[in-house]
Amino acid sequence: MATLSLTVNSGDPPLGALLAVEHVKDDVSISVEEGKENILHVSENVIFTDVNSILRYLARVATTAGLYGSNLMEHTEIDHWLEFSATKLSSCDSFTSTINELNHCLSLRTYLVGNSLSLADLCVWATLKGNAAWQEQLKQKKAPVHVKRWFGFLEAQQAFQSVGTKWDVSTTKARVAPEKKQDVGKFVELPGAEMGKVTVRFPPEASGYLHIGHAKAALLNQHYQVNFKGKLIMRFDDTNPEKEKEDFEKVILEDVAMLHIKPDQFTYTSDHFETIMKYAEKLIQEGKAYVDDTPAEQMKAEREQRIDSKHRKNPIEKNLQMWEEMKKGSQFGQSCCLRAKIDMSSNNGCMRDPTLYRCKIQPHPRTGNKYNVYPTYDFACPIVDSIEGVTHALRTTEYHDRDEQFYWIIEALGIRKPYIWEYSRLNLNNTVLSKRKLTWFVNEGLVDGWDDPRFPTVRGVLRRGMTVEGLKQFIAAQGSSRSVVNMEWDKIWAFNKKVIDPVAPRYVALLKKEVIPVNVPEAQEEMKEVAKHPKNPEVGLKPVWYSPKVFIEGADAETFSEGEMVTFINWGNLNITKIHKNADGKIISLDAKLNLENKDYKKTTKVTWLAETTHALPIPVICVTYEHLITKPVLGKDEDFKQYVNKNSKHEELMLGDPCLKDLKKGDIIQLQRRGFFICDQPYEPVSPYSCKEAPCVLIYIPDGHTKEMPTSGSKEKTKVEATKNETSAPFKERPTPSLNNNCTTSEDSLVLYNRVAVQGDVVRELKAKKAPKEDVDAAVKQLLSLKAEYKEKTGQEYKPGNPPAEIGQNISSNSSASILESKSLYDEVAAQGEVVRKLKAEKSPKAKINEAVECLLSLKAQYKEKTGKEYIPGQPPLSQSSDSSPTRNSEPAGLETPEAKVLFDKVASQGEVVRKLKTEKAPKDQVDIAVQELLQLKAQYKSLIGVEYKPVSATGAEDKDKKKKEKENKSEKQNKPQKQNDGQRKDPSKNQGGGLSSSGAGEGQGPKKQTRLGLEAKKEENLADWYSQVITKSEMIEYHDISGCYILRPWAYAIWEAIKDFFDAEIKKLGVENCYFPMFVSQSALEKEKTHVADFAPEVAWVTRSGKTELAEPIAIRPTSETVMYPAYAKWVQSHRDLPIKLNQWCNVVRWEFKHPQPFLRTREFLWQEGHSAFATMEEAAEEVLQILDLYAQVYEELLAIPVVKGRKTEKEKFAGGDYTTTIEAFISASGRAIQGGTSHHLGQNFSKMFEIVFEDPKIPGEKQFAYQNSWGLTTRTIGVMTMVHGDNMGLVLPPRVACVQVVIIPCGITNALSEEDKEALIAKCNDYRRRLLSVNIRVRADLRDNYSPGWKFNHWELKGVPIRLEVGPRDMKSCQFVAVRRDTGEKLTVAENEAETKLQAILEDIQVTLFTRASEDLKTHMVVANTMEDFQKILDSGKIVQIPFCGEIDCEDWIKKTTARDQDLEPGAPSMGAKSLCIPFKPLCELQPGAKCVCGKNPAKYYTLFGRSY
């Protein structure tokens, strides 16, 4: 047998494997060496990385050592201990119980298994050796006796001592995930709380099951119990014998145990009945309480009307007499109650003589018939809290009004006062938390019971797959906040996913009715073990069977084409050779051929499959999916929940399941690949002898927080990946080369080879960035090294990024070379002198010395400008004409190509790397100085040999691709905030796009001064999100605020809004609209008046709940829109038809608390808008205004912002909630392939006027009331974001002239030290003269006369800000009586005579506006097309276009389209995840609807062409 090789990571040595090696070394040849990973190499194709797998293999090959036992029983026991050591013994949570279990097993044994040493002893001993908790027990002499004996016995043996001596095993606690900030809420410190002296209580009523609202209360109390090392009392509130049921006490205790809450004390309110009764009698005797026999309904009315009861002034004797009747439970006593005498005139209803005791003759579960009177919860609670020593009573804010009553009782009785601390009640959407309502569901048989997975009970959510840890994390994230919010269920399930995703094993299930066979004749029927979890080997292995016939889902098969390569997960690549279809065109089977050698899985479709084999038959599986119980997210106060019960909330699908699923136990959580997470509700049962049937495995789908459906089958990844690949290689394939002589084929071959190396380098980097499998990376690296070797053999030099074969450069004409060499030499002198100046300043040399060096530098710069006609710009050496077309080609002097020069160049570069490395590692100063000296000597040798300064290669092209990988686009908004940049010099990107920011590169010890990152670092076509973020911040439009979703609009952005405002305001005033202002606050009752309207906004409404530290009596909403604020006033103002029409508009801000990822301008929590609200007597008038306003909105976009729009009407699904119909303008952003709503004009009909009573007397029918017809219309600051997305480019913002804050920026050029002061002043005066002239003709102009920035920096700055025209003027221009105008939209430079300045610039500005609109119109025209089938629609949609399709208008159909066109990014990396939604029904469709045309759904007749697309 060949020698085995064990590689050991010395930082984390596999102690068990090393012990096994010691015991088998006499039987097996094995070498041990250090490395980065723990791996056993058996052969080229076989390796083991799991310690237990290594142990098993060594024991099997060295049978004489007997480490794997002597029979099957011992073999099984050893496997148990291997699993035990890897799981239970490695967990810090259960270490104490686990070590006690081990102690019990060793009580009568020398070894764990059998009568000799085995793998069981090795692996358990190794785990304990590295366990901190065990070592601590040994140190404190608290280790269990039998484990200590066994551990010491093994430790004394030679093999264990040998391993312990060679390998240092550092004790660690059980594996802990890397620490990161937890998603937890803010727990407010308790006032007056002292460590160890806090007592809190959890007082549920034993009348039902706990729901997660109760769980929040219990967990908050536990939090303060633990954090203050205090006491938690679990108290059953059993004050009402009618509700109290002993069965529920047991249930609640079980629910509390499920939450891992351990109360310090269990009590009952009934424990204190005697004391409470005495306190009640004390109040009667002191005249603070009275007995009342007023009927309940009358008492309620009197309290509402603040009328005193007739018994309120009864004497104490009379009250005591009536109290005795209550205690006896007599007929009269049962009609009475005891009331506190507080204040019937109080504004707080809870203080109007509340009930303290009532008479009930039912027996009590604990006290039987001892009492006939029972206290109310509100009376008993403060007394029992005081008696039991509760220091802090945690209560929800709904008890706020009762707090005053709580303290009154405490003070009236003179007992100890606990502190009340409030927190918000947990409100969840689409469900009910009331026990009464939940009981109704159970009694009606609409659910399976209190543990139904649709129920919000603790048991219900646990049965649906919620883990206790996930539930605790969710509730902890809410903290002790008092903000009342309605929580989406998605949030709670997203927390749960974080818990289950890292540990849920992965299995396969196929939809039974859609399975398609795939024939793979060459496949062998065999079984291999694969990981249950791709990222967590500790989850274990599962068997996967392979056979010549496998099954896939039909939806996957439909996406295949013949000849296509498809990846079968956990198998490899297969080529589809034949697709068999029946007469209907439906696929019935596939033929495929193995292509397992091809490991390229990037471009392939991934499918799940199951093999047909008698060894492991698929099992029947039923997948159950539950929906919400209630269809409406938030129920109004007076709404009947029964009206919104979802009668179809349970769906089942019959599946063919992975054979491994037969081993699932009830409660096991798994993931079905490409379907989601599931929990086993009913394990699989084999064929029963009684029924002769097998019982399927029932799995319940666990939501994971997605707000959309996960696509299951038929998903493809090709398009995006291929596009990415093409982008990656494009710079190398398409790089222009200079025209050369005919004899340069060798050079061309070299360049092709150079480009291949560059492309392969990108492939390797991409693989590493994506953390691809090691074998894939190794294969790519191997190919890269092979190409580099071939390149070196062909060219005789090492491959260097950014340094293509130099032979090309040698064919350039000699005249051009000489000229460029001279300029290059001068450029290098300037750079070198710049280095001298910087060095002198860094060393704080005398001022005179620095001035002398600066004068020399300025003189060299002037010579350079005279020679080249250009300003000196760092990082932009002079290039020949031919070199302009190839920015990556060297323009070094010919001497560089000598062998000696090449060797010396490489030495300098290498030494530069050494210097940088030493500085990075913060090496000692003397060591750095020696390296720097050596570098300077090498540079001096290089200069003496070549005649020019050493200049590192400025790498472009390949190295540009090596920048940081873009971060995930769905990261949190604050992470996305760009850092503030310091202003500084930078090259003009219009002159040399694609180059590096500075010329420093490999081999540079001290490069030129670092260039400031003024320009954009992201490209619009590569990373739109980063590009957008950089454009709006670097162009000074937006500044981020510390509240997510709220932004500071800087003057540059606000000026655009002002331009829009000025135009629109003037136009609506022509229509008779007047401006006004209404308050931003809305009362809760007003907001809830229009229920449909409120439901649409409910999740986004922000609420004010507190003034200072005082809670408001009722929360106040901040307007999400103003209908509910304005229309009560309209109702007052409209008395007659003569009061109509009312046409009002307000320019204001609104708040909508979006939960999606905020984007400045596009999706924000606060934004500016105008909202118009009008009321008319007739529908015709209202309908006319709707279209008038829509036309004005279109003018804003098309005439001001130069953005074409599509006008149309919204579908029923997308229209404004509460309105009759909505008209809209839709714009298109080709960079993302998504549309965006530009503005909307709604016809509300009479819906709101009926709700708010906006009525007038019908002039035609006297005495008849008529409701007004209303419109509302709005345009927001979203317009600015749309403009940025549509027109912006890779240099920054592009502003249409009509909305630009500055239309022309004047920049003086040529101001150098050589320029006389008179000429400089004349130039500045000329700039100011131009400014004055342009202002006189209403051109918005600014002169940038700052003297601390170069013209190049200013060019960049104003290009980034999108100014339409840059006016450049220099001394030569003044002499020629002209200036240069540079267009921002095209980069075109125009020379304009001075006397034509006003007319020419006005004409150019108008032309820019037209050009921008024309360009955007062409873009929209090419990206908006017609499709008549669903297949065509999906293809066009996925190519980034918007599509007009025949549509029936049904909401269900639209939901189906959205779901069908959705893509999941887990399955299709980079795919747009959202489905298509209807944008509008265009007023002018691209083509007419043909008679009899069908909707794309294929079911209903089409009504009209509707524009669909992905949208913001």
Swiss-Prot record:
PROSITE patterns: AA_TRNA_LIGASE_I, AA_TRNA_LIGASE_II, WHEP_TRS_1, WHEP_TRS_2. GO terms for cellular component: aminoacyl-tRNA synthetase multienzyme complex; cytoplasm; cytosol; GAIT complex; membrane; plasma membrane; ribonucleoprotein complex. GO terms for molecular function: ATP binding; glutamate-tRNA ligase activity; GTPase binding; identical protein binding; proline-tRNA ligase activity; protein homodimerization activity; RNA stem-loop binding; zinc ion binding. The modification Phosphoserine is found at residues 434, 747, 882, 885-886, 891, 998-1000, 1350. Residues 709-744, 869-900, 956-1012 are annotated as: Disordered. Residues 1007-1512 are annotated as: Proline--tRNA ligase. Residues 878-887 have a biased composition (Low complexity). ATP binds at residues 1152, 1154, 1163-1164, 1237, 1240, 1276, 1278. Residues 709-725, 958-976 have a biased composition (Basic and acidic residues). Phosphorylated at Ser-886 by CDK5. Phosphorylated at Ser-999 by RPS6KB1; triggers EPRS1 release from the aminoacyl-tRNA synthetase multienzyme complex. In monocytes, the IFN-gamma-induced sequential phosphorylation at Ser-886 and Ser-999 releases EPRS1 from the aminoacyl-tRNA synthetase multienzyme complex, allowing its association with the GAIT complex. Phosphorylation at Ser-999 is specifically required for the RPL13A-mediated interaction of the GAIT complex with eIF4G. This is Bifunctional glutamate/proline--tRNA ligase.
